[in-house]
Amino acid sequence: MNSGIDLEMSFTQGVQNLGLSHELAHLLWIPLPMLLVLVSAVIGVLVTVWLERKISAAAQQRIGPEYAGALGILQPMADGLKLLVKEDIIPARADSVLFTVGPILVLVPVILSWLIVPFGQNLLISNVGIGIFLWIALSSIQPIGLLMSGYSSNNKYSLLGGLRAAAQSISYEIPLALAVLAIVMMSNSLSTVDIVEQQNTAGFLSWNIWRQPVGFIIFWICALAECERLPFDLPEAEEELVAGYQTEYSGMKFALFYLAGYINLVLSALLVSVLYLGGWGFPISIDWFSSFIGLSIDNPLVQIIAASLGIVMTILKAYLLVFLAILLRWTTPRVRIDQLLDLGWKFLLPISLVNLLVTASLKLAFPMTFGG
């Protein structure tokens, strides 16, 4: 099958077929990636918020959202509209510039990271050759926005929440990057498309989760910590810090923090799907499937079926992980700040280093299995 392609090429060729010049086609493409990212991210957040509220209600033997649309499906949209029209209050002693820039600096890197996520065989907004490196670089910007928001609020609870968020993010960013580096080493590429293609040779047996089980666990723990999900929600612990760095925020600025958090959760689940669970790949080989139905793999019908099911597989794997994250929220207690830092620096960091060294050794010893 064809490898994942850049949507820009398909769009440009389609516009040129209508008689427009290449320069005009490229100019028309410029705003589309961000539009696609915003639409997919917002839809992902709306679904995730609804799922979380319904699952949380089930865990507490409640009904949950019910009146806004069928089964309360429109409740997240109603909440967003409510926050949109609420008054935007800036504390009198706050730094108004940093207070405003902080939430934006938290949200923008998370949205930009969606550019590298391949949703299907031929559904990729930007096939960046260094996609993984770009994602790690963008994710390192978010703690600056959190610290800026906490500091600029001129509130002791906000400042403590911002400091906790920065410490937590730095502590878990390193083992997260080392876990991803082991995948990059096996795939010989920083491209998310190449990583998925490398996993789709023998069905689910070729998924990276079997060759990197330790890396998978490290990545998932670090991803939950980066998203500040329970049991790692220390920066906004209600019993200790009111709402952490969000304490003085209201209206749409307050909503931006939650929007960034849920977008980051869905993004992390998608990246786990791409890096460890074969992305758009099926549990069975597509070659075996095409031979089973008696059609060539190059048959247009097989290509359409594979592309459509590939998108479904990517989203299904991601939302299974989102479901797991929501369950963890209601089944695990919050850790203390010293336990959180000890887990990152004394446990996950050494294990991720050992995992990287073992992966390098196995790559040399078994190049066919570990991508030599």
Swiss-Prot record:
Any single GO BP term: photosynthesis, light reaction
Catalytic activity entry: a plastoquinone + NADH + (n+1) H(+)(in) = a plastoquinol + NAD(+) + n H(+)(out); a plastoquinone + NADPH + (n+1) H(+)(in) = a plastoquinol + NADP(+) + n H(+)(out)
Function: NDH-1 shuttles electrons from an unknown electron donor, via FMN and iron-sulfur (Fe-S) centers, to quinones in the respiratory and/or the photosynthetic chain. The immediate electron acceptor for the enzyme in this species is believed to be plastoquinone. Couples the redox reaction to proton translocation, and thus conserves the redox energy in a proton gradient.
Ion transport keyword on record: no
Protein's UniProt name: NAD(P)H-quinone oxidoreductase subunit 1
Annotated transmembrane regions: 27-47, 97-117, 128-148, 166-186, 204-224, 266-286, 308-328, 347-367
Family: Belongs to the complex I subunit 1 family.
Pfam families found in the cross-reference section: NADHdh (PF00146)
Enzyme Commission code: 7.1.1.-
Alphabetical UniProt keywords: Membrane, NAD, NADP, Plastoquinone, Quinone, Thylakoid, Translocase, Transmembrane, Transmembrane helix
